[in-house]
């Protein structure tokens, strides 16, 4: 516990908010290149093979893991993708999403509902 005098000399510092998607550098989206596309398993109560990609962000080259949403994808090594923030709760270390229907990432096939989230045009 500091004394009043100590607080007068050096006031308390307010803690700055933690950035949840630091690799985006305060941008809404960033372009990235896929380094490795693979599947991984989720945390304890859930069971699946979740599709993820290790991507290298254009401009300054930091590598992050991004989730590939939707059923089926056409991504492979050297695919250019657009990533956004947003974690996947049951995959530790996955703090970014790949935007479907932008750049090399194709929209989800035969998608009828929630099309805007998966890059599908109205048919």
Curated annotation (Swiss-Prot):
<comment type="function">
    <text>With S4 and S5 plays an important role in translational accuracy.</text>
</comment>
<dbReference type="GO" id="GO:0003735">
    <property type="term" value="F:structural constituent of ribosome"/>
</dbReference>
<dbReference type="GO" id="GO:0006412">
    <property type="term" value="P:translation"/>
</dbReference>
<feature type="region of interest" description="Disordered">
    <location>
        <begin position="1"/>
        <end position="25"/>
    </location>
</feature>
<dbReference type="GO" id="GO:0019843">
    <property type="term" value="F:rRNA binding"/>
</dbReference>
<comment type="similarity">
    <text>Belongs to the universal ribosomal protein uS12 family.</text>
</comment>
<dbReference type="InterPro" id="IPR006032">
    <property type="entry name" value="Ribosomal_uS12"/>
</dbReference>
<comment type="function">
    <text>Interacts with and stabilizes bases of the 16S rRNA that are involved in tRNA selection in the A site and with the mRNA backbone. Located at the interface of the 30S and 50S subunits, it traverses the body of the 30S subunit contacting proteins on the other side and probably holding the rRNA structure together. The combined cluster of proteins S8, S12 and S17 appears to hold together the shoulder and platform of the 30S subunit.</text>
</comment>
<dbReference type="InterPro" id="IPR005679">
    <property type="entry name" value="Ribosomal_uS12_bac"/>
</dbReference>
<keyword id="KW-0699">rRNA-binding</keyword>
<protein>
    <recommendedName>
        <fullName>Small ribosomal subunit protein uS12</fullName>
    </recommendedName>
</protein>
<keyword id="KW-0694">RNA-binding</keyword>
<dbReference type="Pfam" id="PF00164">
    <property type="entry name" value="Ribosom_S12_S23"/>
</dbReference>
<dbReference type="InterPro" id="IPR012340">
    <property type="entry name" value="NA-bd_OB-fold"/>
</dbReference>
<dbReference type="GO" id="GO:0000049">
    <property type="term" value="F:tRNA binding"/>
</dbReference>
<comment type="subunit">
    <text>Part of the 30S ribosomal subunit. Contacts proteins S8 and S17. May interact with IF1 in the 30S initiation complex.</text>
</comment>
<keyword id="KW-0488">Methylation</keyword>
<feature type="modified residue" description="3-methylthioaspartic acid">
    <location>
        <position position="90"/>
    </location>
</feature>
<keyword id="KW-0687">Ribonucleoprotein</keyword>
<keyword id="KW-0820">tRNA-binding</keyword>
<keyword id="KW-0689">Ribosomal protein</keyword>
<dbReference type="GO" id="GO:0015935">
    <property type="term" value="C:small ribosomal subunit"/>
</dbReference>
